Each structure stands twice: as C-alpha cells, then as structure tokens.
C-alpha cells in the first residue's frame, strides 16, 4: 500500500515546536510516499476548534490520524468518534486519557523535568530562590515537567520553589507573567520554564527589569540554541517535536502497511548547554527527522 493519507493534528501555529512536528510529519510522508493533511486550530490550543477539526478530519476519511489533544481530558468524545469511524489513531506528545490508539509516541516529560531542574540546582550550588513557570494547564507535557521540577527540588534542601502563574507555552504570555512576578519578588536566583518559548519571554522580562538569573527551557528550538550560544540561556532539553511528529507519522504509515508497531515509543532526550549546542545549531528547516531504525527498537 502507498499513497496513504494521514491527518496530522497539532495544537497551534504559535509554538515553533509544533512547526517542527509538522515538518517532521512532512519529511516522513515525503520519503514514505504518503500524503499529510494538517489540522491546526486558528486560536492556539482551542478545545472547541479542535473538536470541530476532528469532525472535518473524519469527514475527509483519511487512512489514519496522528493526534495530539489540546487538552487530554476534553477530547475523549472526539477520540471516541474517530474510533467509531474506524480510523486508526497514533497518539503523540500528550498521552490520551481515553480511547483506542495504535501507539503513543513521546518522551519522558517527568524525567526530563527532574534532570534539567537538577542541572539548574547544581549550577546554583544547591541553594537559591527559584521561580517555576508551567505551560498550558491542560497539557500533560507541562504537568509532568512541573512534577519533575518539584520532585527534583525536594532533593535539594537549599532550594526554594516559587511558582508563577502559567505562561501557556507562549512567549508574550510568559513575558507578561514574569514581568508582573518580578515586580513583587525581589529575589530570583534561577528560573525553571516548561518550554523554550516561555524561556525567551522570561529572559526578555528579566532584561527589561535590569535583572539577571540563569534560565532553563525545554525543546532545543533554534532560538533557544542561539540564546545558549550567546550566554543568555543556561540550558535546554532536546525534547524534539520534529522527531516525535515524524516517528508518529511513520508509525501510522507502518501500521497501515501491516508492519509491527510497538505499543509505546519513548524517545530519549539530552540536556543541551554551552558544551554541546553545536549539534543543534541550525534552523528547523535544516534539521532532519531520523530514520525509524535509528530510534525505534521492536
């Protein structure tokens, strides 16, 4: 079988990580002889729009769907509708809370949260007042990364965590939230951020306030790599949405072609800092989604 049509869902067009996921899906489709249809809410992370997009996708009768819910609990009925239509689903990035799916593709958000938090705490010498900003409240990635941040902090007696309001995984929101937080918080020794986009907003707020603090992020986006290169950002984690989106799309294609697909595919991550950023120092368009055999063991 060839020429399969895969409906690929992403949450928004404002977070570059989802640009990367779409690029990964497109790369894999091109080399597999499949076709991708993208479904993206016009309003970022909008539940109502995604519900409507699911109905549009079902009506288009794709061979499979690659699906990330904008909210893991609010799309249960939509996933049931996809299941009832007999369309195979590959779940990626945010694990579904209900429904049937061929496989889940992602990374261990809890572990990466623990690891990058410990990296920051070591940098601070094991003590300090650390601000923490989560992303979209309904996103599993944010919830698990924050849980990892907090569990890591419990292992460092000298670390105190100060939680800010969520930055919704948006740079403008994160900048506004951090500016308000800084206005009432005289001491911030470091900042944990659940993604790179928010980290960039946090850095802007710190700089506008004439203050300095080491900041970490997640995603290894080109803008974050540039900030590491210049010394503005301490570190990030290569939670690679391009790889995840690409492998999820390939999982859908392989399933349709009768090939075996693992029930879960968890891709490894690593911390990116001044010592190793060169491997990621290129635009998204010049990055490559690895082959299935490089990442998936059956």
Regions found by a protein language model. Give the residues of each.
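Hinge/beta->alpha junction and helix N-cap segments in small-molecule ligand-binding domains
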Residues: 9-23, 38-49, 71-72, 94, ...
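Hinge/cleft segment of the Venus flytrap/periplasmic-binding protein
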Residues: 1-2, 133, 137-140, 152-153, ...
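Signal peptide-proximal N-terminal region
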Residues: 23-40, 154-156
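Immediate post-signal peptide segment of exported/extracytoplasmic ligand-binding proteins
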Residues: 1-6, 30, 124-127
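Short, low-complexity disordered leader/linker segments with a strong preference
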Residues: 1-5, 58, 80-87, 298
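Short, hydrophobic alpha-helical segments
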Residues: 58, 120-124, 182, 248, ...
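Hydrophobic alpha-helical
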Residues: 58, 64-83, 149, 162-163, ...
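Flexible loop/hinge segments that line or gate small-molecule binding clefts
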Residues: 72-111, 119-123, 129, 135, ...
